[in-house]
């Protein structure tokens, strides 16, 4: 079964970078545009990873983490959030809400191939 990743990303540059890197790695990726679409995608795809831009305006990343971690069918899915390195309060909030990993945007970009392939 192919690795599947769901990405919650508003920034078109990062979405394009994720899509291109996923294609090269043979990883299926989807970009739901709302909380209901996210829930449907998670139930349908049972992703290996959910990536979330912690600055997303479309979907509240803190609510995403709380909802996924509270549901026994989705609580095992790893959540990775990325943020601007100066937003330490956002990092703390994400960690407290259930994100398994929270990394600066620069590290996310640098290690994207490994993150998507599950080797990092």
Where do the model's predicted regions map?
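Conserved acidic segment of CheY-like receiver
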Residues: 3-12
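Conserved phosphotransfer microenvironments
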Residues: 52-68
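Output/docking surface of receiver
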Residues: 98-110
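Acidic, metal-coordinating helix/loop segments flanking the phosphotransfer/catalytic sites
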Residues: 34-49
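Short hydrophobic/Thr-rich beta-strand motif most characteristic of the beta2 strand and flanking loop
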Residues: 26-33
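Alpha4 helix (beta4-alpha4-beta5 surface) of REC/receiver domains from two-component response regulators
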Residues: 86-101
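A short, hydrophobic beta-strand element within the central beta-sheet of small alpha/beta folds
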Residues: 76-85
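Conserved phosphotransfer cores of two-component systems
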Residues: 69-75
């Amino acid at each position: 079964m192919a690795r599947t990743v769901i990405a919650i990303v508003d920034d078109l540059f990062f979405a394009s970078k994720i899509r291109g890197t996923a294609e090269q790695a043979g990883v299926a990726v989807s970009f739901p545009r709302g909380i209901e679409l996210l829930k449907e995608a998670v139930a349908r795809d049972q992703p290996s990873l959910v990536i979330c831009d912690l600055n997303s305006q479309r979907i509240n990343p803190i609510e995403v983490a709380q909802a996924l971690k509270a549901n026994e069918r989705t609580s095992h899915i790893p959540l990775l959030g990325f943020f601007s390195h100066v937003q330490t309060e956002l990092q703390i909030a994400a960690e407290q809400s259930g994100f398994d990993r929270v990394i600066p945007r620069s590290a996310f970009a640098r290690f994207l191939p490994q993150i998507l392939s599950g080797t990092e």
